[in-house]
Regions:
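Active-site metal-coordination/substrate-binding segment of hydrolases
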Residues: 89-144
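N-terminal helical capping/dimerization or prosegment-like subdomains
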Residues: 2-105
Length: 144
């Protein structure tokens, strides 16, 4: 049994359809795959999310948001999109991250024909590096 959604919750998720999500998630997954970043392993290169950040910024601007970029490290900008409301009600903040882990054991990515950043659908599942951490989630956030 599922909890009943409020009218506000229904409105927030009404923009998320399977087709829109699949298209956007696929685009986000293949865009600007970052290098690894692991503070416990200084031999790995630093992370880089600039390409995905600029894509997200463009998507938010297209939705009519004011977009700000904050960069505390080179090639790792944070994107903030602001959509001003018309009333004095509460603020809704949605947040996600854009980095993904590097591909480990590429020989095990048989569901994607050994192309981990190629989103591949099998039934109700979407396989790709970043599909659940967290480009798929990010697609939902943008569509909401």
């Amino acid at each position: 049994m599922y909890a009943k959604l409020s009218e506000f919750e229904e409105k927030v998720i009404s923009g998320i359809t399977e087709d829109r999500w699949l298209k956007l998630a696929t685009e986000l997954i293949k865009t600007g795959q970052p290098r690894a970043c692991d503070p416990l392993d200084p031999d790995l290169p630093s992370g880089e999310e600039e390409a995905i950040a600029m894509l997200v910024a463009g998507k938010l601007e297209a939705l009519g948001m004011e977009v700000n970029k904050y960069e505390s490290q080179p090639h790792r900008p944070n994107i903030v999109g602001i959509l001003k409301g018309s009333g004095s009600g509460p603020v809704l903040m949605m947040n996600d991250h854009m980095d993904t882990y590097p591909v480990v054991e590429p020989h095990k990515w048989d569901k994607t024909n050994f192309k981990p950043f190629k989103a591949t659908r099998a039934g109700d599942l979407l396989y790709a590096r970043g599909s659940s951490d967290t480009r798929g989630n990010l697609a939902c956030t943008i569509l909401a």
